[in-house]
């Protein structure tokens, strides 16, 4: 457990009142959104599944915790098949394959580089996202 928590950058566990015996939840220590996500990612490491599905794993983190959660998510998905739902295009750009969906339908599929070069919907999304980051 300690190894899994360390691998997902959940260093806060050492500051809990009763260490790893601390009760978590409504009757115990309240986790903030980043801590809750780190704990969920540590649990994935403990289970060691072959396939991981993550839906907006960094959505609630805010800018301060996003980097830690992105690094932790990378650790969890390394050497596993992973389906990652992400609205942040910097996360999508790191994927082996990107599926672009509109109205519940896949409208484009390819690597980040292929999709940017294609000039379709992903290209428009990437240009708008990149402009907003400049």
Segment roles from a protein language model:
Residues 4, 21-119:
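ABC-family ATPase nucleotide-binding domain "signature/switch" substructure
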Residues 9-10, 117-134:
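C-terminal boundary and immediately downstream tail of ABC-type ATPase nucleotide-binding domains
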Residues 11-19, 23, 27, 125:
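The feature encodes the conserved inter-subdomain "coupling" segment
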Residues 15-16, 35, 103, 126-127:
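Short loop/turn and capping residues at structural boundaries
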């Amino acid at each position: 457990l300690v190894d899994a928590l360390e691998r997902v950058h959940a260093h806060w566990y050492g500051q809990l009142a009763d260490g790893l015996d601390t009760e978590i939840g409504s009757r115990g220590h309240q986790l903030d959104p980043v801590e809750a996500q780190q704990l969920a990612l540590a649990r994935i490491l403990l289970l060691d599944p072959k396939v991981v599905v993550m839906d907006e794993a960094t959505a609630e983190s805010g800018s301060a915790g996003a980097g830690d959660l992105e690094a932790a998510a990378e650790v969890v998905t390394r050497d596993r098949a992973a389906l990652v739902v992400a609205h942040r295009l910097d996360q999508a750009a790191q994927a082996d394959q990107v599926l672009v969906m509109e109205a519940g339908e896949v409208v484009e599929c390819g690597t980040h580089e292929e999709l940017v070069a294609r000039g379709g919907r992903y290209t428009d999304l990437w240009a708008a996202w990149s402009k907003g980051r400049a």
